[in-house]
Amino acid sequence: IESGTEILDLGTPNDLSKFIASSGYTVHNTKGENLDTDFQPYLDTGVDCITAFEIFEHMLAPFNILSQLKTQKLIASVPLKLWFASAYWNTKDDWDKHYHEFEQKQFDFLLEKSGWVVKDRLIWASPDPKKIGLRPLLRYFTPRYYMVYCERA
C-alpha cells in the first residue's frame, strides 16, 4: 500500500492504527459502534483501503460487513484458534469476547465467500516470556496470529 493512502481502520484508535498514521498514511477509525448492526456509514467511504486488526473475532456475523464494503483493498488480522486454549471470554465486558477464533482455512473461506481474494498472508507465534508453564511454552511454537492482504474479487 503506497504511502499517503487513505485508510479506514475498523475499530477504535489503537497502537497499530497510530503507527500507520505516523508512517505517512491518513487513517480514520470507527467510533466503537457495534459493527454487526451499525456498519452502514462505513460501507462506501471513498477510502483506498480498509484495515481491521483483530475485530472480526468479536463480531457475531463478520460476513455482513465484509461482503458489503466498497473498497478494493483489505488488510485484516485475527487471532488463530489454539488447540490447547479455549476462546477468550471476558465475563465482565460484552465487547471483550471472542465469538470466533478462526483456523486459517476458516478465515480464508469467510473472505472468499464475502468477495475477497487473499493476495498475501502472514502467520506468526506470540510467546510470552514472562509466563511459565506448558501453555506459555506451546505459544513459542504454535502460530497465534494471522494477517491477510486482500483485494476484491
Locations of regions flagged by a protein language model:
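Conserved acidic residues
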Residues: T5, D48, Q72
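Conserved class I S-adenosyl-L-methionine
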Residues: G4-P13
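A conserved beta-strand element that flanks and buttresses the S-adenosyl-L-methionine
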Residues: T51
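Glycine-rich phosphate-binding loop signature in dinucleotide/nucleotide-binding domains
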Residues: I1-E2, Y42-G46
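S-adenosyl-L-methionine-dependent methyltransferase catalytic module, highlighting the catalytic core
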Residues: T12-F19, L60-A153
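Adenosine-cofactor binding site in Rossmann-like domains, unifying the SAM/SAH pocket
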Residues: A21-D44
